[in-house]
């Protein structure tokens, strides 16, 4: 971390650190994970917290105050780290630090799938006032943003994917009621696992949605195999008569991947540092071509 970066982080800490008397002695370390270098571990005065800075041109759905409210509800159920402070004006979020692991390989383990399914079953019934996550709305938003970009020239493949996403989104919205408090961004980097339980971070895309949306996010964004997808369905729904079939989950996974692809394409145009987003779009594009 450069001196300029440290000065920027410390200035942000002065706005949210609970103990003004120790903030100048706080040790700061950049944390990995995610698409942007914006999270920092801050240790001092007997405290260990994570500071998250805003990203210019952010693609986040919720504002930081709404995100903090959603995360606090999850934390009250021990499903997320506690929110320590939020500064809506500066876009800052300070949360408790949990020394837990996350790796793409870890979320593929059978025991991890069991833990995450248990976590989602506990998260989804929580009564949190959040906007409804409509797939048709997000599809239209991303495609409209791209269409307004002078440098964007979609080929036949992207036009076909856009039509497919619109169709899948309409079907999903009309077929599955938004009954659950969904996280909607279940990349491995947003899932913390300690061997006994799983917890979630980064609730920027949280909203009311169908439980199947979170299952598709988890399976699609972490490249679950067919066997892992079936285990996820079995762990979440058990013997419920109305449980979706594997084909239903696979269609939702395809939809989530298409949405993430166009999200990445919009980010390429909007963000100044979008290399990771470009790589994501390219990776998802390769997966989509496989069917």
Model-flagged regions — what are they?
Residues 1-24:
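Juxta-kinase regulatory segment immediately upstream of eukaryotic protein kinase catalytic domains
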Residues 29-136:
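ATP-binding pocket architecture of kinase catalytic cores
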Residues 30-46, 50-51, 166-213:
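Active-site acidic catalytic loop and adjacent metal/ATP-binding pocket
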Residues 56, 100, 198, 206-208, ...:
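Activation segment
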Residues 85, 101-162, 170-180, 205-209, ...:
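A cross-family kinase active-site recognition segment
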Residues 133, 242-254:
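All-alpha amphipathic helical-bundle segments outside canonical DNA-binding/catalytic cores
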Residues 149-159, 262-291:
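ATP/Mg2+ or Mg2+-diphosphate-binding catalytic cores
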Residues 212-241, 254-272, 285-287:
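Active-site activation/catalytic loop segments of kinase-like enzymes and analogous catalytic loops
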């Amino acid at each position: 971390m450069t001196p300029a970066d440290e000065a920027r982080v410390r200035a942000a800490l002065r706005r949210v650190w609970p103990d003004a008397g120790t903030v100048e002695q706080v040790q700061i370390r950049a944390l990995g994970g995610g698409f942007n270098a914006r999270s920092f571990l801050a240790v001092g005065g007997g405290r260990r917290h994570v500071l998250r800075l805003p990203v210019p041109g952010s693609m986040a759905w919720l504002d930081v105050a709404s995100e903090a409210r959603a995360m606090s509800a999850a934390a009250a159920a021990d499903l997320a780290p506690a929110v320590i402070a939020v500064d809506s004006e500066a876009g800052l979020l300070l949360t408790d630090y949990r020394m837990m692991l996350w790796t793409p390989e870890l979320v593929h383990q059978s025991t991890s799938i069991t833990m995450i399914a248990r976590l989602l079953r506990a998260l989804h019934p929580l009564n949190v006032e959040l906007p409804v996550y409509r797939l048709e709305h997000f599809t239209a938003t991303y495609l409209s943003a791209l269409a307004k970009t002078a440098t964007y020239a979609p080929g036949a493949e992207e036009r076909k994917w856009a039509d497919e996403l619109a169709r899948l989104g309409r079907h999903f919205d009309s077929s599955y009621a938004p009954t659950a408090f969904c996280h909607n961004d279940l990349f491995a980097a947003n899932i913390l696992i300690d061997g006994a339980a799983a917890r979630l971070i980064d609730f920027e895309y949280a909203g009311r949605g169908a439980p199947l949306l979170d299952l598709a996010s988890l399976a699609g964004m972490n490249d679950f195999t067919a066997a892992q997808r079936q285990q996820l369905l079995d762990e979440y729904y058990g013997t419920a008569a109305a449980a979706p079939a594997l084909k239903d989950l696979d269609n939702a996974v395809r939809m989530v991947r298409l949405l993430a692809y166009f999200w990445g394409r919009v980010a390429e145009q909007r963000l100044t540092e979008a290399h990771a987003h470009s790589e994501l779009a390219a990776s998802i594009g390769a997966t989509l071509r496989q069917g």
